[in-house]
């Protein structure tokens, strides 16, 4: 595998200030754009479920920032297909979000095939739930990261 040189134009110290353990810069997801029929309504829907803040509007986007610093930038669009977004949450956050989903009358499912309506799953010793946002994007909340083999489906 080829290694590309990392350069930081204008930096007197090169990229050392951007490197992590072993001199390698940690790779992190910073943001993603989520197409929406109504960017404000979609951003607010997610923010309400996850108990986060939507906005303020930034250019073409309405951002929702997660606790680990990833920004979901909602943008008005008319031409898009459904996407999937999974959020790792604590047990307490899961309980609160599931209560908000149910209180809002949002249909939820135990798996991505939208089977077992009204149920949750217990994969990998945790809990998970799937539900659609107003644009048809499939959202997922999990309390444990998934591994190579599902357990407790």
Residue map of PLM features:
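Glycine-centered loop/turn positions within well-structured domains
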Residues: 62, 70-72, 83, 92, ...
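Vicinal oxygen chelate
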Residues: 2-8, 13-24, 29-37, 78-153
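A short local loop/turn or secondary-structure capping micro-motif enriched for an aromatic residue
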Residues: 72, 80-83, 147-150
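A cross-family glycoside hydrolase active-site/sugar-binding cleft signature
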Residues: 75, 88, 142
């Amino acid at each position: 595998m080829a290694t590309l040189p990392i350069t930081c134009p204008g930096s007197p110290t090169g990229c050392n200030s951007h490197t992590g353990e072993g001199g390698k810069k940690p790779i992190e997801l910073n943001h993603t754009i989520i197409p929406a029929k109504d960017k404000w309504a979609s951003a607010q829907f997610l923010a309400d479920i996850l108990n986060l803040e939507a906005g303020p509007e930034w250019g073409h986007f309405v951002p929702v920032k997660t606790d680990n610093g990833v920004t979901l930038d909602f943008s008005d669009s008319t031409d898009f297909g459904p996407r999937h977004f999974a959020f790792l949450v604590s047990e307490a956050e899961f309980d609160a979000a599931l209560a908000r989903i149910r209180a809002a009358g949002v249909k939820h499912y135990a798996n991505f095939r939208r089977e077992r309506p009204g149920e949750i799953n217990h994969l990998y010793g945790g809990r998970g739930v799937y539900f659609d946002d107003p644009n048809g994007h499939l959202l997922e909340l999990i309390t444990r990261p998934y591994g190579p083999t599902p357990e407790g489906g």
